[in-house]
Amino acid sequence: MYLDHLTVQNFRNLKKLDVDFDPNVNIFIGKNAQGKTNLLEAIYFLALTRSHRTSSDRDLIGFDGEYTNLAGHVQKSQVTLNLRVLITKKGKKVWINRIEQAKLSKYVGQLNAILFSPEDLELIKGAPSLRRRFMDQEFGQINAEYLYFASKYRQVLIQKNNYLKQLAKGKAKDQVFLDVLSDQLAGIAAELIYRRFKFLTYLSHYASDAYTHISLGSEKLSIAYHPSVSDITADDTTEEIYQKILNSFNRNKASEIRKGTTTSGPHRDDIEFKLDGKNAHLYASQGQQRSIALSIKLAEIQLVHQLTDEYPLLLLDDVMSELDHGRQSALLNYIHGKTQTFITTTDLEGISWDIIKKPRVYHIQSGTISLEKEN
C-alpha cells in the first residue's frame, strides 16, 4: 500500500498542505522545529487516529484553529481508499470513501504505518508503560479484535478502579458489584493476553531474523511476555487465562479495595527483550539497543505483511543520523522495494545514496512544503 496524496489543515504548525508523494522514497529536509516531525505525525494520525507524541488530540489543533482536518488517498493492491479524520475540541470523526464510520475500530487498519524515531530506544530501556502502549498501538492497527478488546479493557478498568476508590472511602458497600466488574474485566483481559502472546511470538521470530541481518553477529534476539499474573503461560487457553486472572482478583480483593486500584492484569504486564537470554535493558550496549529497536520496527513490517498481505508505510523521523552506515544499509536493503518510506532529516549528508535511488526530496520551512528534487 502507499499514500499518494495528503491534505492537511491546521495540524500543529501545518496550516494548509496538499502534497503528492512518491510510492517509494520521500525525503523531507529542513531545520529543527519547521514541521518535519509534524508531517510524519499527521500521516501516523491519519492511519491510527492517535498520536505517538501526545495523548490529547486537542494538542494537535493548530494555534487559533477550531479544528484539524486530515485527508489521504491510499492505493492498496485490491482497492483505492479516500480516508479522512476530523479533530475538533469535542472529539474526532473518521470517514472511509466519504462514509462516516460510527466506530474507530472500523477505520483503524485501513492504512498501516510503522514509525521509527530516536525515542524508540526507550522501548528497550524505558518504563513498562511504554512497552504496553507499543503493543496496544501496533497490534491494534493490524487486528480489529485486539483493538476492540484493548479499548473495552480500558473502559471496564476505569469503571472498576472508580468503584474500588468508592469502596476504599466508604462511599460504597456492595462488593457483589465489584465481583461483577472483576469477572467482566477478567474475561476481556484473557482475550487481550491471549492475543499478545500470539502476536509477540510472530514478532519475536521476525525480530530475531532482522537482528541477525543488522548486527551480523552471533547473538540471538528474543522477546518474552511477562504477565503480572505470573502463572499464566503462552500455552493457556483464553478460558484458563480468564480463570487465573479472576483467581488473582479474588485473592487480592482486600488489597485492591485498600489501595483503590486493580493490582494485576494486562495494564501491569511487561515485555522483555533478550540477547542470548540476557535482559537487553540491563546488559545491552547502546549500539545493541539501537539494533534491537531497529529490528523490532523491521519485524513489525513483516508482521503487518503477514496479517494483511500489504506492506505498511514506514516513517523514519530523524533516525538516519542516529544510524551508522552499516545499520543504514541494513535498514534500507531490508525495506527496498517493499515499503513506501518517509524520511525526515536536517540535511542530506550521511544518506546512503547508493541504496536510496531516485527519491523525491521536499524542503520544509515554517510549516510549508516545497518540492526540491523530483526523482
From Swiss-Prot:
Q: Provide the binding site for ATP.
A: G30, K31, N32, A33, Q34, G35, K36, T37
UniProt KW keywords: ATP-binding, Cytoplasm, DNA damage, DNA repair, DNA replication, DNA-binding, Nucleotide-binding, SOS response
Q: What Gene Ontology cellular-component terms does the record carry?
A: cytoplasm
- Under the GO molecular function aspect, what terms does this record hold? ATP binding; single-stranded DNA binding
Q: Which Pfam families match?
A: SMC_N
The record's similarity note reads:
Belongs to the RecF family.
Function statement: The RecF protein is involved in DNA metabolism; it is required for DNA replication and normal SOS inducibility. RecF binds preferentially to single-stranded, linear DNA. It also seems to bind ATP.
Return the protein name.
DNA replication and repair protein RecF
Organism name: Lactobacillus acidophilus (strain ATCC 700396 / NCK56 / N2 / NCFM)
